[in-house]
Amino acid sequence: MDPFALRRLGRTSLELPRLGLGGASLGNIFDVIAESQADATLDAAWDAGVRFYDTSPWYGRGLSEHRIGRGLFLRPPGEAIVSTKVGRVLFAPADVAAFAASERSWPNGLQFQHRHDYSYAGVLRSYEDSLQRLRRNRVDVLVIHDLDLANLGSEELVSRHLDELDAGGGMRALEELKAAGLIKAIGAGVNRMGTIPR
């Protein structure tokens, strides 16, 4: 099996390799890694033939996207396939010191708080912010991220955010981005089957 052989993704025009680089570790999910190690990881992946990179605003509260953006910036344009996620919008904390003292999710992540937002405006804001962090004018895939009980904590919140995605226009925003050619595919990254029933 060739891990880099391309396969069509569902009914989209996008072709993906079987193997890609997941960006959670570049956001310090398991351990704090230095910038030099992040750069070396991205260089080694590229040199080994990896061209598919998956990340999220949530990974390191933007750190993973910054690192991947920096790592791909000087590579030949159009060779990398990039996937990121929507559903969380980052913003500056009102009290930076209190936030830094309480932060446990992402050690040495960027100093941003987040709010879940699957609405039309939230999806577009998340997409545009990700483009800035990734140093790109488009990404290939946008994934609806963590819209599930495991991450939101209650069925009420899951239901509310599903309503944002549906009646609040989040799905419409994704479809408009795809129709405009600004993304090639829409996905869902959840931890429970059947979470997104519509």
Give residue ranges: language-model regions.
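N-terminal binding-site loop/beta-alpha segment at the start of enzyme catalytic domains
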Residues: 1-99
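Glycine/proline-rich, positively charged
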Residues: 30, 103-198
